[in-house]
Design a protein with these regions (language model features):
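Conserved loop-to-helix N-cap of the C-terminal "lid" that shapes the substrate pocket in Rossmann-like
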Residues: 145, 195-200
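Active-site "gating" loop of Rossmann-like NAD(P)-dependent oxidoreductase/epimerase domains
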Residues: 60, 98-121, 136, 151-162, ...
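Conserved Rossmann-fold NAD(P)-dependent oxidoreductase catalytic core, especially the SDR/UDP-sugar
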Residues: 53-57, 64-72, 76-123, 143-144
Length: 200
C-alpha cells in the first residue's frame, strides 16, 4: 500500500478495518508526484517479479482543484504508476479511472469506448481521459481499467470517509421531501439516470 510519509499512521487503522496484519498489508512510503512514485530502488529490486496485481487508485477527484494539480496527480501520477509497475514486473496493472473519462458524452458510454468521449472542457474530464489513454497505450503490461460512476458509502452500513459528490444532491432531496406532499409523483426523464456505485 503506497502511503505518503505523513499518512503512515493511518495504515494501522486500515489494517484493523480490513482484519489484516502487517504482513498482509505492507506500507510502502512514496509520493504520487515523484518518479516511480518515490519508491526506493532497493524496495523495487527486492519485490520485482513478486507482485501479481498493481492497483492504481490515487487521483484528485475534486472538481474545484486547479488544472495543474489535477494534471500532476491524474496524468503524471498514472504515468509514474505504470513506470513503477513495469519496474516491479507486475502481472497486471489495474487503474480505477472514472466515468468522467467519457467527458460530456450523451448516452451510454461502454467499457470498449474511449475515442468517442464527448467534450472534455473541464480539467477533471480531460485528465481522467488522458490518464486512461496512457494506460490503454501500454504494450508491455497487461492492464484493466475500471470506470465507476459516483461512489457512495458501503451498501450495508452506509459508511463513507468523505462527503462529496452525490451527498450534496441527497441533501437537496431531503429538503425537497419536506415541501412536496408524500405520494406525489415527480416527472423524471431518462437523461436523469445516475450511475451510483457503493464503495464495496
Amino acid at each position: 500500500l503506497l502511503v505518503r510519509p505523513g499518512s503512515l499512521a493511518k495504515v494501522d487503522g486500515l489494517r484493523e478495518l480490513w482484519g489484516a496484519n502487517r504482513r498482509q498489508v505492507v506500507a510502502v512510503e512514496g509520493d504520487l508526484s515523484e518518479p516511480r512514485l518515490g519508491v526506493k530502488a532497493a524496495w523495487i529490486r527486492q519485490h520485482a517479479g513478486k507482485i501479481d496485481h498493481f492497483f492504481h487508485l490515487a487521483a484528485i477527484y475534486d472538481m474545484q482543484a486547479s488544472a495543474e494539480s489535477q494534471r500532476k496527480s491524474n496524468v503524471e501520477g498514472t504515468r509514474q504508476a505504470l513506470v513503477l509497475a513495469k519496474a516491479l514486473k507486475t502481472g497486471c496493472f489495474h487503474q480505477v479511472s472514472s466515468i468522467a473519462a467519457a467527458g460530456l458524452y450523451e448516452g451510454t458510454f461502454t467499457e470498449d469506448m474511449f475515442e468517442e468521449a464527448g467534450a472534455l472542457d473541464h480539467p477533471y474530464f480531460q485528465t481522467k481521459h488522458e490518464s486512461e489513454g496512457i494506460v490503454r497505450a501500454e504494450k508491455r503490461l497487461k492492464w484493466r481499467i475500471y470506470r465507476p460512476g459516483m461512489v457512495v458509502g458501503h451498501s450495508v452500513t452506509g459508511e463513507m470517509d468523505k462527503v462529496d459528490g452525490p451527498y450534496y444532491f441527497f441533501e437537496t432531496l431531503r429538503s425537497l421531501s419536506k415541501v412536496v406532499p408524500e405520494g406525489l409523483p415527480l416527472l423524471m426523464n431518462k437523461a436523469g439516470l445516475l450511475n451510483i456505485v457503493p464503495v464495496d
